[in-house]
Amino acid sequence: MLDVAGATASLPALPSPVAGTSRFIRYAFMPNHLHYCGGDDNRQIFNYALAAVREPPLEAMLRKFTGAMPYLNLIARGNGIRDPFDERVVEAYWIGNELLERVEVGDLYGSLRDRFAKQLSPRLMELVAAKAPAGARPHHGFHVFDVWRNVARLDGDVLATLDNCRISWGQVVTIDGGQLAVERPPLVLRGGKLALDPARPERVLRQIDGQGFADFAQPGDWVSLHWGWVCEVLSERQRANLERYTRLHVAIANQTI
């Protein structure tokens, strides 16, 4: 068992360098740290991810992320995968991969109606659910740009939240202790529509108390970012997928902005 309060006991070997639960935490950690989602287990899940350990107590903690879990379950079922925290499923939701293409449109549509029919007006419910046949996928970008954004008018505060909440990508320029200087394309409002501007310099956090998930990032590397936090170093395949699914869901959101 992992002593999530501090030191660790003997740790079981993992079947892969980055287990699905560990990757999930890399992305969920900062919004949870900011009290936007999940339970009150921030330091515990952080320690679990640092140790790369998966145990039943951790899974119970992660299931408190009620915004993400239905998408993970949907992706897993659509691909015949039993474990919603399978590494491929987790990557599909946060970054994007081919698993998203195997989820049936009707399943996403039905899931959205089941989840949000009591929270949204009939007009907004149909607007959101109709994005499934319009090409939306069960990706975090869709959740941010279309499900979360149920406002009639975008302003600066909402735009900043969308930009922080989406998973973005940046290229490392320099390293400064627990921070990185990166070049990142920001989300902007242009002509009343969402768009991505050319990359701009930005400072992001990669460590808390000297610990993080991208300790070996080097200048030139691509990293993923969530609420100003460096989630992990990306391969070129992952970066390309993240950009592809981000641009897809920006375009789909713009259909009703």
Where are these regions (language model features)?
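N-terminal intrinsically disordered, low-complexity, charge/repeat-rich segments that act as generic
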Residues: 2-157
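Structural detector for short beta-strands of small beta-barrel domains
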Residues: 160-183
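Short, basic/aromatic beta-hairpin or loop at an interaction surface
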Residues: 187-207
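Short, well-ordered loop/turn sites that connect or cap secondary structure elements
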Residues: 216-217
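Short, Lys/Arg- and Gly-enriched loop/turn segments at beta-strand edges
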Residues: 228-241
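Short peripheral tails and domain-boundary helices/loops at the edges of structured domains
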Residues: 238-257
